[in-house]
Amino acid sequence: MTGAQLRIGTFTPSLLIDLARSTGRLDRAGLEVTEIPVPSSPAQFRSLETGELDVVMTSPDNVLAYRFLSANPLGHTLPVDILAGIDRGLGLSLCLAPSVTGLADVRDRVVGVDVPESGFAFVAFSLLERAGLGPDDYKVESLGSTPRRAAALTAGTCAATVLNAGNELRARASGCRVVSTVADIGPYLGTVMAALSADDPTAAGPRNRLAEAVIDTARDIVTGRLRQEVLEAAGRLLGLEDPEARAHLGCLLDRTHGLITDGHVDEASINTLIDLRRRHSPSPDLAVVASAWPTMLTAAALGTGPRT
């Protein structure tokens, strides 16, 4: 019998989706999931709005921006919900190009971002600020998704960018340097699963089942049940050699940077996102965000959903 079909937009190929499929969780949930790579966060949310995508893996800052702030790249808000928290950044790090010997050399050079008004960009700006570099000390250039920025960094198109999800490991193996991580800023939520609000159970049901399947897969990884499967998928999907694949597995298991095993979105990490926006993109609308953000969470993200 054909399962419910879902199209999910991702920046970097998702090990969780891949392993949920290979372990049979998607089949048991009655789901056929197609993963579609997206070039940037504006493109991702534009496709979500038009119905080209049903679900996205994205930064929670994107959800805050597109739900509450009309001054987002689309120019209007969307009724988007967080279905589950996925990870805490997966090694989100400030990285330097092979030719850049230190942070001082970033001065007057290009810092690559997805788009300037985005959560990962704010992390880059904050980590550079901690190193003594302000916004007038470098040029900001939109280079798109994390894999695209990793390629640009390795090629020397930009001097610095933030990378994660195995991209930082592949870049380091190509001669790039990791100089700081998002943990230097505070508790962080790197990826969530999100979708447009859906009151119709025929639409909401498959999305919620996908969130549950991914959460359960994350739990299996963290408890050590899928070690070899993770290493194989890291090589096949992310292009990581064995040492980098093992480092990525360690990152998935790490409590500071790794997977979230219950889907819960915590207040401290959301506050970090809001504080970063206040510093790097101040807006009076952020006062509303600070009080209204729980309204974007579904039961699993609130930590109240049913568990199997």
For every predicted segment, state its role.
Residues 35, 140-142:
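A structural preference for short, hydrophobic beta-strand core positions in alpha/beta folds
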Residues 71, 148, 154-237:
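Pocket-lining segment of extracytoplasmic ligand-binding domains
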Residues 274-308:
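Conserved C-terminal helix/tail region of periplasmic/extracytoplasmic solute-binding proteins
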Residues 1-3, 307-308:
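Short, low-complexity disordered leader/linker segments with a strong preference
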Residues 204-283:
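Secondary-structure end/capping motifs
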Residues 53-56, 154-155, 252-267, 299-306:
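Short amphipathic alpha-helical segments at helix boundaries and their inter-helical linkers
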Residues 2-133, 159-165, 179, 187:
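Short, glycine-/small- and polar/acidic-enriched structural segments
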